[in-house]
Amino acid sequence: MINILILDTDIGIRNSLKLYLTEIGFHVEESTCVDQAWDILKRKKIDLIICDIIMPGMGGFNFLHQLRLNTDYCTLPVILLTTRGLTQDRIIGYKTGCDSYISKPFNIEELVVIIEGVLNRHTLIRLKLEKKQKNSFLLIKSNNLKINFTPREQSVLNLVVEGLLNKQIAANLNISIRIVEKYVSRLFIKTKTRNRAELVKYALENNLIT
């Protein structure tokens, strides 16, 4: 369930918003001041804030500024409410980092559309970021690939990478050439390579040498 925090001193606004938003499936928390809002943020997971600009003490702009400076809440969606429809206020709001802006009195259905649009945008951004991070992780993982080699397989691989022939590897490890050939074949299978050149390249690219 999506959790929305309403920060507004107007009890009528809070009650009407809570009633409507709850009926359409949102969970709503209420706050009348910034300190109370911070307390709620620390205790509960909030997905979006609807915040009035004009409040006693710290106003909505300053609260938004604090949010954007906090690494835990810097991307938290915020919709600003105001009784003032001044262009300068909207400019300040957007520069400070609000996601949307609506003037009182407002149509609650319009606000819901704005809420859904903001949440959808943030969800898409989050999914793209997660995909990018996942791809980065997979790239790092592939560059540091771990394959379970037996001690003898690892020894053979190390010598293959050094450029030794099967006869030389056999002499070095005091085993027969036929046994070396079997180990090399196993290495091809485990690394999905087809020849010694591919095996060496694969081993070097994935840090498989010990």
UniProtKB/Swiss-Prot annotation:
Organism expressing this protein natively: Cyanophora paradoxa
Q: Which PANTHER family match?
A: REGULATOR OF RPOS, TRANSCRIPTIONAL REGULATORY PROTEIN TCTD
Which protein is depicted?
Answer: Probable transcriptional regulator ycf29
Compartments, record wording: Plastid, Cyanelle
Q: Does the keyword Plastid apply?
A: yes
The gene name reads ycf29
Q: Which Pfam families match?
A: GerE, Response_reg
InterPro entries with a match to the protein in the record? CheY-like_superfamily, Sig_transdc_resp-reg_C-effctor, Sig_transdc_resp-reg_receiver, Tscrpt_reg_LuxR_C, WalR-like, WH-like_DNA-bd_sf
Domain Response regulatory intervals: 3-119
One cellular component term from this protein's GO annotations in UniProt: cyanelle
This protein's source sits in the domain of life called: Eukaryota
